[in-house]
Structures are given as C-alpha cells and as structure tokens.
C-alpha cells in the first residue's frame, strides 16, 4: 500500500458513497487508476465491504452499556452455554473474552436506563455465572 491507497481508504472510510471520479480527483489520480486501486484493495481483502452507519438515537438504542462478566467456570461447555444465552439478546451487540480480573465484556445497547434494568434482570435469570 502506498500513499494513494491510504488516501483512498481514508476518503472511503469517511464516505463510501462517493463516485470513483470524486475520489480520484481528491487524491490526484485519474478515474481508471483510482478504480483499479479500489478493485485491488477489495480483491486482496483490504476493503472488506461498504457499510451504512446508523444513528442509535433514531433506532431507539441511545444508551450504550459495557457489562463486565466474572465467572468461576472456565470450561468450553460454560462458554458455549453462555454464548447461546447471549445470542438470544439482541441488545448484546458485541461479546469479548478478556484477560485479567474480568472474564467477559458485553457491549449492550438499549433505549434508556430502565430498559437496561429490564435487560439485566433477564440476563441474570438466564445465565449462571
């Protein structure tokens, strides 16, 4: 990757809906070489896809909460069981295994604190920590 590729990536990460000719103009290339660079980055996996960013407030999930999970069960069966429980909660959008004092970290999105309380009670009812 050279400076043109990095510039193209930076532009596309800010707004991937721009035309190739607009991107080319911004980086100082003609359209065809810019298009070839984008195609090469897609083919090599540097560019995995193009996404639309949503507004959490408009989707009624304006509160993001990070939930720390500690457990004394460190076996594959427990992890599989907990992962199945977590999949039943659309509020959990990310799930990480950690190191140190924290075993797992959940990223949860809900409309407000009241909704988080409801989520939390449902989670502790279903999971065994």
Model-derived features: where do they sit?
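A compositional/biophysical signature of low hydrophobicity enriched in polar/charged and small residues
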Residues: 1-129
């Amino acid at each position: 990757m050279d400076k043109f590729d990095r510039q193209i990536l930076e532009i596309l990460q800010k707004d991937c809906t721009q035309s190739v000719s607009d991107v080319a103009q911004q980086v100082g290339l003609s359209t065809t070489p810019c298009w070839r660079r984008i195609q090469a980055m897609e083919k090599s996996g540097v560019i995995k896809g193009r996404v639309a960013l949503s507004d959490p407030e408009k989707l009624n999930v304006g509160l993001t909460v990070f939930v720390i999970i500690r457990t004394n069960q460190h076996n594959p069966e427990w992890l599989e069981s907990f992962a199945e429980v977590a999949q039943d909660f659309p509020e959990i959008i990310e799930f990480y295994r950690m190191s140190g004092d924290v075993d797992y970290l959940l990223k949860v999105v809900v409309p407000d604190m009241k909704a988080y309380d409801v989520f939390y009670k449902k989670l502790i009812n279903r999971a065994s920590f």
